[in-house]
């Protein structure tokens, strides 16, 4: 049931919204996916060679290039600094697996990008450690909180208002009582700040969210990961009932974000269908899938449908009920969320592991889905 959908569907001033992208606003978007039933190894650790093969196949498919080196160079040029944004908050099982980030790093280095020009980053060091990134040699890890910090000059303003707390850049410590701080004298703001990593340190971003639900946004995916997942004063977007949907779409459309994110690869090796964006291993299923697209909206729309399917099996409300920001992003021209405007295409591999003829194929008949494995 879990994969049935896949195969059946086979400065302080708000930035102006970018014009609709011609490849997503008026044409169908393509979400490529790679499946491997053997990708998850012992002790819930993905097998690196299989992950690397899947990533190489996806990058060739997305770009239409014949080799991974040529594919990576179509996104990142030598001398550019690239930030690989991961989603480590859901933990070692439900979050972005280090093997996926490592495959991207190795692919970029093989394509001629200096290792010193590549960073792997997220909001908190403790999340990266919990997810196992500190155990992978050669990764240049960076984090925002208690690390690089937020940029006081990179302000994002929206209509959503939130209460500032300790850790937000504009929060001012007070000697008042807790009741005063949380009551009428609470510090309120409609501003958030971009992290210095994004505003100053990197030229391009490869976003690697995981296939994880979110209590706040339905899916903790491409859009949420590059908005709620990186800003301070993010709680103002997560009050429920669609309160922050339009604002989240506005934030992602800011040129300082949307122009830097060149590719989204979603780690669907495991699907976490409840408890997100926090660790919840009991609500995870081995899924054996990676997805990739230039359209972050299409990736998130696909993820919501997969989550809805699994939550239906588990007799839970649909995740899409809290995922209104995806439709808002589509309405603002950031991509496609309509299932009829999204083409699901599978990357195929030859008997020796090479990408099959045509580099990526869509089976004419739906193959049998991988059996979901409950953890």
Predicted feature locations:
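Boundary at the C-terminal end of the N-terminal hydrophobic targeting segment
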Residues: 11-15
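Bacterial N-terminal signal peptides
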Residues: 1-9
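Extended, low-polarity segments enriched in aliphatic/aromatic residues
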Residues: 16-78, 89-91, 95-102, 106-375
